[in-house]
Regions:
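Thiamine diphosphate
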Residues: 231, 235-263, 468-476
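Short acidic, glycine/serine/threonine-rich loops at helix termini
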Residues: 75-79, 111-114, 180, 202, ...
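Phosphate/diphosphate-binding loops
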Residues: 103, 259-303, 516-531
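Flexible, low-hydrophobicity surface segments
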Residues: 1-142, 245
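C-terminal catalytic domains of large/alpha subunits in multi-subunit enzymes
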Residues: 68-69, 219-224, 254-262, 290, ...
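Glycine-rich loop/linker segments at domain edges
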Residues: 6, 12-19, 144-187, 193, ...
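Conserved catalytic cysteine-centered active-site region
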Residues: 87-89, 221-229, 255-266, 273
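Extended active-site and interfacial segments that coordinate phosphate-rich ligands
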Residues: 11-15, 36, 113-120, 124, ...
């Protein structure tokens, strides 16, 4: 019986629920620990002219206060995000400009408040707008994509559709959103005085990525940094690379070699140090003939970026391959501001881009007088519109049809604002979802026979709470042809074979391919009865067959929305997602992934918004009381199913990525359902009751 496809409880579950799983801040090291707290800027732009640390240094338990004038020097300061305590420049409010090392966390936090800082303050700019004077076209956008694409002629198609078809030309916006994983970013690190060797217990999605990124910054070889991350309490992309807090801890460890330096980023600092989803605006232009067949697709996107480091969401990229049209144009703009650097947040680019594109498709369906599902089906491409390659598998239409049957789509009100259930206005919405399949190159795995039919499998992957530990055990079992109980898996350590980041929905595909490669080499060399100690290491090989195809995971989201006709209160009693992701490794955890992603989409539609004070430059919603995310009462009935399939071209396991597609398109399904319930067409997220008040019925 195959282990892959078997619904399996999390192997790390008992350790987590009994409190024995150690997270980054809980690790111990040589001697008594030292606690770090940063000193941060209170201006958004300018320079530090002086720092009086005398009162802070005199506090009980304080061991040191580091500033730009006495901190250890970094070897490479070319990456501005990592230039911590090296100069006096201030590029955003909340930037680390110093740090306190103390015997307790409380002493460190108190002492940093006593550091007196003087500034030369300069005017700052944190106001995002599409007509910003510094807007520019980036050379590349997130994911390595070209910023622009063009096929055919948009102008004539739009002009023809104005008189002989239908046109949608609207703009859609998404706000800043901040990652809030259950475990905030945290590091415990010590510098070996006999080294140099830096050991870091880091809450990261990429142990090897942390080591390779920080090594040149610190003047070390990659092998001189060991990063250990056996358990990580969520990340959503924000832990995909090191940030300022990693450099802070490294500086502290260099200053006090032999001592374990500990720092857990506070919830408030999560809104400054570790990246966020930037604001976006998407202008969508759709042209169709009278029957709704698309003749042109245009998607122009503006993304907030930072003067610290460029990061541009690839919001227009999904529109390059989603639907068929002979004339297509996509374009990206960046707006640099005096803000911290944005970074990955679950489905960067795809999430805001799909919201815009899928609401626009709903608008086109209404203009054409078509059912929104039928419009999508009629524009489903036979081959990839961008590359012309055939699909490895494209079953979006099957997802839409299956979802319609399960959800009861035939009961959808044909006319917006036409169904009532007491005081509640009821509507249904649908949206398509797509997320590119990715296998990152370079991951390696080691397999060792331990005797008695047992095997040890080692790979430097990391489980960020998604079930990787369990899934890779199932993959290894099938790769070796043994029961899952015969596998002992080791992950989360740079002492293990190299592994790529847990990001881009690529983890299982990348690491699993390495395990299959190692297992194949192991069996070829040692057969089915290997001697104890037999060992093989191999890297995931190239997949030239896949290069002939375009591989994307697809899905369809359905939502029921109820809006209070008196107050505009919005409730979402039902959501359903149907997905096509190839073979499912562990149904139990992949369903959890889907539902988590759909909850993300619900949150994006109705709740999440980071509010930045333009006067001072900082986010004021710096806690989970002011920054709203869904509660159980908001997410009452969310279900996810998937098609039974194997993608023989994508990976040796037949899998495609599953981690992020749940929150691609789900926000659009909710917003489209709001329109169906009320007649209100909302194009700016999040949707609150005040946006609906003018659309509520006058006569009750």
């Amino acid at each position: 019986m195959s282990a892959i496809g078997t619904s399996t409880p999390r192997l790390d579950g008992p350790a987590k629920v009994t409190g024995t799983a150690q997270y980054a801040f809980e690790h111990t090291g040589p001697g008594e620990p030292v606690f770090l707290h940063p000193v941060t800027s209170t201006i958004a732009r300018g320079s530090v002219t002086s720092m009086d640390t005398s009162e802070a240094e005199s506090q009980p338990g304080v061991l040191a206060v580091l500033t730009p004038w006495n901190a250890p020097r970094l070897a490479d300061t070319s990456e501005r995000e990592y230039v911590i305590c090296q100069d006096t420049d201030v590029l955003y409010r909340g930037q680390p400009i110093g740090l306190v090392l103390a015997e307790t966390a409380e002493a460190a936090r108190w002492a940093q408040s006593l550091v007196r800082v003087e500034y030369d303050q300069q005017p700052h700019d944190v106001g995002f707008r599409t007509d910003h004077p510094d807007v520019y076209e980036p050379e590349v956008v997130n994911g390595g994509y070209e910023p622009a694409s063009s096929t055919g002629e948009m102008g004539p198609s739009l002009a023809r559709a104005q008189t002989h078809g239908h046109v949608v030309d609207q703009s859609y916006s998404t706000p800043e959103e901040h990652n809030n994983p259950m475990e905030p970013h945290a590091v415990s690190a010590h510098w070996d005085p006999d080294g140099p060797l830096l050991t870091m217990y880091d809450s990261t999605q990429s142990p090897h990525g942390v080591a390779s990124t920080l090594a040149p910054v610190l003047g070390l070889e990659t092998e001189q940094i060991r990063v250990i991350a056996p358990h990580v309490g969520g990340g959503f992309g924000s832990k995909g690379a090191p940030h300022a807090h990693d450099v802070l801890v490294a500086l502290g460890a260099m200053h006090l070699p032999g001592r374990l330096i500990k720092y857990a980023v506070t919830r408030q600092q999560m809104f400054v140090f570790v990246g966020y989803r930037p604001r976006t605006v998407s202008r969508i232009r759709l042209a169709s003939d009278a029957d709704g067949r698309l003749t042109a697709i245009g998607h122009e996107a503006w993304s907030q970026s930072s003067r610290v480091k460029e990061f541009v969401e690839q919001a227009a990229v999904p529109s390059r391959s989603m639907y068929a049209a002979p004339n297509r144009r996509t374009f990206h703009h960046a707006v640099p501001l005096d803000v911290p650097a944005p970074y990955w947040m679950r489905a960067p680019g795809e999430a805001p881009g799909a919201f815009a594109a899928e609401v626009a498709m709903d608008e086109l369906a209404e203009a054409c007088g078509l059912d929104p599902i039928e419009l999508r089906v009629s524009n489903d491409p036979e081959t990839d519109p961008e590359s012309g390659r055939p699909w490895s598998s494209r079953r979006l239409v099957d997802c839409l049809r299956e979802g319609a049957d399960r959800f009861g789509w035939s009961e959808r009100p044909a006319t917006p604002a036409s169904r009532r259930d007491g005081r509640w206005m009821v509507g249904y919405g649908v949206a398509s979802a797509a997320y590119p399949h990715m296998v990152q190159s370079g991951s390696q795995a080691t397999i060792r026979a331990e005797g008695g039919g047992r095997y040890r499998v080692q790979v430097g992957a990391v489980d960020i709470g998604t079930g990787t530990w369990t899934a890779l055990t199932l993959v290894a079992a099938d790769a070796l042809g043994v029961p899952a109980e015969a596998i002992s898996l080791e992950i989360g350590d740079t002492a293990l074979p190299y592994a790529t980041v847990a990001g881009g929905s690529s983890g299982i595909s990348s690491w699993g391919s390495a395990i299959f490669a190692a297992a194949g080499r192991f069996r070829t060399r040692y057969g089915d009865d290997p001697p104890a100690g037999a060992e093989t290491t191999a890297a995931a090989g190239d997949n030239p067959e896949l290069e002939r195809y375009r591989a994307i995971s697809f899905g369809a989201h359905f939502a029921e929305v109820r809006v209070d006709a008196d107050t505009g209160e919005i409730r979402v009693p039902r959501m359903l997602g149907v997905f096509s992701i190839g073979r499912v490794v562990n149904p139990r955890t992949v369903r959890s992934q889907f539902i988590g992603g759909m909850t993300f989409g619900l949150s994006m539609a109705l709740h999440e918004q980071s509010v930045r004070d333009t006067r001072f430059g900082h986010v004021v919603t710096q806690n989970l009381a002011d920054y709203h995310v869904p509660t159980h009462a908001d997410a009452t009935d969310i279900d996810a199913v998937w098609l039974d399939e194997v993608d023989e071209f994508a990976t040796p396991m037949g899998t495609r990525g599953a981690g992020e597609i749940g929150n691609v398109g789900s926000a659009a399904a909710v917003v489209n359902a709001i329109h169906n319930a009320t007649g209100a067409r909302i194009r700016d997220l999040p949707v609150h009751a005040d946006a609906l008040l003018e659309h509520l019925p006058v006569d009750q």
